[in-house]
Amino acid sequence: MSKAHPPELKKFMDKKLSLKLNGGRHVQGILRGFDPFMNLVIDECVEMATSGQQNNIGMVVIRGNSIIMLEALERV
């Protein structure tokens, strides 16, 4: 069994990201931290509701297994 390697996310630190999550959820915010399981700490997080409404939800931890897609919104 191979050993898990930490995700290559250092280049995304302190950058604004767009995250697509399971359940059709979409959030944007600034990456402040991560761990080997790809759990992310996102600051200034904004939930983009399907109605077009934006909800500011502050600093959150997003569990790695709920992330479908991650996109940088700033040059890395």
Curated annotation (Swiss-Prot):
It comes from the Eukaryota. The keyword DNA-binding does not apply. Residues 4-76 form the Sm domain. It holds the Pfam family LSM. One of its GO terms (biological process) is RNA splicing. GO terms for molecular function: RNA binding. SUPFAM superfamilies: Sm-like ribonucleoproteins. It is found in: Cytoplasm, Cytosol; Nucleus. Core component of the spliceosomal U1, U2, U4 and U5 small nuclear ribonucleoproteins (snRNPs), the building blocks of the spliceosome. Most spliceosomal snRNPs contain a common set of Sm proteins, SNRPB, SNRPD1, SNRPD2, SNRPD3, SNRPE, SNRPF and SNRPG that assemble in a heptameric protein ring on the Sm site of the small nuclear RNA to form the core snRNP. Component of the U1 snRNP. The U1 snRNP is composed of the U1 snRNA and the 7 core Sm proteins SNRPB, SNRPD1, SNRPD2, SNRPD3, SNRPE, SNRPF and SNRPG, and at least three U1 snRNP-specific proteins SNRNP70/U1-70K, SNRPA/U1-A and SNRPC/U1-C. Plays a role in pre-mRNA splicing as a core component of the spliceosomal U1, U2, U4 and U5 small nuclear ribonucleoproteins (snRNPs), the building blocks of the spliceosome. Component of both the pre-catalytic spliceosome B complex and activated spliceosome C complexes. As a component of the minor spliceosome, involved in the splicing of U12-type introns in pre-mRNAs. As part of the U7 snRNP it is involved in histone 3'-end processing. PANTHER family: SMALL NUCLEAR RIBONUCLEOPROTEIN, SMALL NUCLEAR RIBONUCLEOPROTEIN G-RELATED. Belongs to the snRNP Sm proteins family. This is Small nuclear ribonucleoprotein G. It comes from Homo sapiens.
